[in-house]
Amino acid sequence: MKNENHPDSAVAHTISVIGSSWTCLILRDFFLHGPRRFQQLQDSLKGTAPTTLSERLRSLEKNGVVDRRFYSMSPPRAEYVLTAKGRELGPIVGAMRDWGRKYGR
């Protein structure tokens, strides 16, 4: 049984939302560039399979971190944008960047 009062449960929940491979890099792209289309993310994240990117975006959307917005254009266009909940992850992504700069190669 899950103990919600355990201090690590909040960390475990955060990891369940953003801890999958590529997810933090997807978030980084949103913080660097703002709203993104699928192909823009695909081009930026060299090496990620389209199915993986699609799964990560679906998970972020399901968890309320990103919204998918559709535009009535020809051809139809969808764009992903951070929600208020997603923008609150900015300090976490920033701290990861700072740590990487300090201790990376």
Segments from the language model and where they lie:
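Basic, amphipathic "hinge/linker" alpha-helix immediately C-terminal to the N-terminal HTH DNA-binding motif
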Residues: G19, S72-A95
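Short beta-strand "wing" residues that participate in macromolecule-binding interfaces
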Residues: R68
